[in-house]
């Protein structure tokens, strides 16, 4: 379960985004809809621990993330949360396999990477560098990287934007 309470984000240019209190129950899927620039990606980035809120709290499975130690935050980011970024966040000069395999450095078991790549119809590009892939292929790699962790929580920021 994810609980958002009195959450807000202030940016240097004085832009402030405020969110309603929201509870995302475990085992359910949710979709955020809104105009460009309204803060959907910012909210996902705060839940993932990439951005810190200016006010309020994010509670994941009973743990208030703003009060958690960095070790606990890392445990959640690595083990509980898979994030499919809008702009892929892949390393262009590395292969598909290496972009997923790099998760091993964080202790993630990627032993079923090949099966994940096959299920997303990108296995044949396993040894290709990211810079040689189409947008849709890069999106599939980003999805595989998020899912290979078997996370409890999947955050997806426009995950099908480049798929055909």
Feature annotation, model-predicted:
Residues 48:
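Helix-to-loop junction immediately C-terminal to a conserved catalytic motif
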Residues 56-64:
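Conserved ABC transporter NBD signature motif
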Residues 64, 110-125:
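Conserved ABC ATPase "signature" region
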Residues 65-82:
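ABC ATPase NBD coupling module
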Residues 129-133, 137-139:
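Conserved ABC ATPase signature
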Residues 150:
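Conserved catalytic motifs of ABC-family nucleotide-binding domains
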Residues 154-157:
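Catalytic Walker B motif of ABC-type/P-loop ATPase nucleotide-binding domains
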